Swiss-Prot record:
Protein name: Large ribosomal subunit protein bL17
Pfam families, sorted: Ribosomal_L17
Keyword Ribonucleoprotein: yes
Subunit: Part of the 50S ribosomal subunit. Contacts protein L32.
GO MF entry, a single one: structural constituent of ribosome
NCBIfam families per record: L17
Key words of the record: Ribonucleoprotein, Ribosomal protein
Family as reported in the entry's similarity comment: Belongs to the bacterial ribosomal protein bL17 family.
C-alpha cells in the first residue's frame, strides 16, 4: 500500500496539482475540492505557513519555488503568516460537504482557520 495518495496521476502531474491547489488556497483562503485532494494538500499548506512565519529571505525564496504566483507569496508572508504568529500548527481545516453531482466524488472545503 502506498504511503501517500496517488490521485490517479504520475508524480509530475501530482506535484503540479498540489502546487496549483496550494496557490489557489492562499489566494482565495477557502477552496472547494475533492476530499482526497484537500487531505493531501493540507500538510503542504501547513508547511508553507510555517515557512512564512520564519519570514527570512531564504524562506521567501523557498515559498517562491513552490507557489506559482509571486503576489500570492507576498500575501502569504505579509497577511496570512502574521495571523498565526501565536499558533503552533493547525492553520487549515477540511470540512466535508457531501458528494459531487456528476460522479459522486466526496467533496470538501479546505480553508484557513
Amino acid at each position: 500500500m502506498a504511503k501517500y495518495q496517488k490521485l490517479g496521476r504520475d508524480s509530475s502531474a501530482r506535484k503540479a496539482l498540489f502546487r496549483a491547489v496550494v496557490t489557489a488556497l492562499f489566494d482565495k483562503e477557502r477552496i472547494e475540492t475533492t476530499e482526497a485532494k484537500a487531505k493531501a494538500v493540507q500538510s503542504i499548506a501547513e508547511e508553507m505557513i510555517t515557512l512564512a512565519k520564519r519570514g527570512d529571505l531564504h524562506a521567501r525564496r523557498q515559498a517562491l519555488a513552490y507557489i506559482y504566483d509571486e503576489s500570492v507569496v507576498t500575501k502569504l508572508f505579509n497577511q496570512i503568516a502574521p495571523r498565526y504568529a501565536d499558533r503552533n500548527g493547525g492553520y487549515t481545516r477540511v470540512i466535508r460537504t457531501g458528494v459531487r453531482k456528476g460522479d459522486a466524488a466526496p467533496m470538501a472545503i479546505l480553508e484557513l482557520v
